[in-house]
A protein has these predicted regions:
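Non-ligating segments of multi-cofactor redox enzymes
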Residues: 1-282, 287-294, 303, 313, ...
């Protein structure tokens, strides 16, 4: 019951921030927020985390894209952004660059993503604040409950009933690659004092804004964006039923995993009730449950768990559930 109440309060904040902030007088925003709240209430009442959370996040992604593109056309008449507009901080702050931004900010006092610092619901300060709140509450749960980009993979991964390619045996390798990529992005961003991920690797440029193509490097970057979107957001989630981009290329997701010890809520596996059927491992969208996780009776998923609840729904023994982390709650108290 306590976890349910906590989730309800938390999601009300999320729905307000992404659905209503800055547009309280918009009928569309009110309808959108009401629909999202309805989905969340249905999820709590039925305990069907799998179905309603998926619809919730997919809807969040699609409507965010529509709203964001509409704002871009109202403000500058195009989805493309020029170098001058970017340097003048005429773009919202993107949470994905947070891990690459923190080290240069701490060492050189340089903000490598030139967004508005304050005075906007998606300014640097407001996004860092919401990130901090999420980190100490649900940690990497951001990826499955809050991220308006991850909904694209979520929706695509739901289309096939069964995975055409099984990657369970490669879970450890995929996790290792994601952390290695995070280290690479952080190191190069510090060395160049630029948002390398945003400039070269972000597949979601197709759903938000992209750099105006004026030279060969920008053209090459655009081709990379398209390839990554098609490959990691569309094709691989469809073939594997996994959140593939989230599990391999997203630096923010990897960074949230490293911050996981600070979060108050996690997933608990009752090892006494578990029959080791591996249905939870097959259902996990983030490659966070291995054969060894179950065989070794660890009692919880691996560090990349995004608390999506897929394992809870999949478990026939009802041996998995959300739970407060006693160690974290004890430190807070």
């Amino acid at each position: 019951m306590a976890v349910t109440i906590f989730f309800s309060a938390f999601m009300c904040v999320v729905i307000y921030f992404f659905g209503l902030a800055g547009s309280m007088n918009s009928p569309f925003a009110l309808i959108y927020a009401a629909f999202m709240l309805f989905l969340f209430v249905r999820m709590l009442s039925t305990k069907n985390w799998s179905r309603y959370r998926s619809v919730f996040q997919t809807t969040l992604a699609v409507l965010f894209m529509i709203s964001f593109i509409g704002i871009l056309y109202d403000e500058r008449g195009s989805m493309s952004i020029t170098g001058t507009q970017f340097q003048n901080a005429e773009t919202p702050f993107c949470h994905i660059v947070i891990p690459a931004m923190l080290i240069p900010l701490a060492i050189t006092k340089t903000v490598i993503f030139p967004a508005r610092m304050i005075g906007h619901f998606a300014s640097v300060v407001s996004m860092l604040l919401i990130w901090f709140i999420v980190s100490v509450t649900i940690g990497r749960g951001w990826c499955s409950w809050v991220c308006f980009y991850g909904g694209w993979e979520e929706g695509v991964s739901r289309i096939p009933k069964k995975a055409k390619i099984k990657v369970l045996s490669r879970n450890k390798d995929l996790r290792a690659f994601q952390f290695a990529f995070l280290f690479f992005i952080a190191l190069v961003s510090l060395g160049t004092l630029s948002s390398v991920y945003c400039e070269w690797f972000c597949p979601f440029k197709l759903t938000t804004e992209y750099a105006q193509i004026t030279d060969i490097p920008t053209l090459i970057a655009t081709v990379i964006f398209i390839g990554l979107f098609l490959g990691l957001v569309i094709v691989m989630p469809y073939l594997t039923r996994k959140r593939f981009q989230c599990s391999t290329l997203c630096p923010f997701g990897a960074f949230q995993s490293l911050c996981e010890k600070a979060s108050a809520i996690g997933i608990r596996i009752d090892v006494d009730s578990c029959t080791q059927c591996m249905k939870c491992a097959e259902a996990c969208k983030f490659c966070a449950i291995d054969i060894d996780t179950i065989k070794d009776k660890k009692g919880k998923p691996e560090i990349t768990c995004a608390k999506c609840g897929e394992c809870i729904t999949a478990c026939p023994q009802k041996a998995i559930d959300f739970a407060y982390k006693p160690s974290v709650i004890g430190r807070i108290a």
